[in-house]
Amino acid sequence: MEIFNSSNIPNLKEEEAIVPLFTLDTFLLPEDQMMMRVFEPRYKQMLDDIVLDGLPYGHVISNPSMPELNGVSVPYDVGVLVEIDQFQEQGSNLLYLANGGRRFRINSLIEPALEPEFFNSIFPSVDELVEEYIEEFPEGKLYVRGIVELIPDLIGEIDTKRWNYLLS
């Protein structure tokens, strides 16, 4: 998987798109739902970038066998697009319902403009962090992005007995 920064993003192929990635240790499958609470500035910036335009983000699982990318966990190469519902602010947190959608494969990663910092209980604002990189990386983001392509939907049915056997 190739890794780019915001100043050297390649031209996209027709079937590719750039998608913000939310890397977690939990699964979200197509048609699943999960309540989310966001408090980190990088993911607040991500939500600012997508919510107003009704765009999805990519829910991916961190891959512990890979080295970190600019201080961020590298994900496995398959994820699920997420549509956001019931978005609300609660104090300094953003809450929403994540709805799993189409599966995608990550072809390349775009690293964040800054390494994430681990703050105690008081986080800086997104604007304060953007000021740290905006001159060097005007197209940069605090979060990881992926150059992705959609995976075709699965077609057909599987017998329940066979499915249970495969899972056991």
What are the residue ranges of the model-derived segments?
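N-terminal low-complexity, acidic/polar interaction/targeting segments
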Residues: 2-168
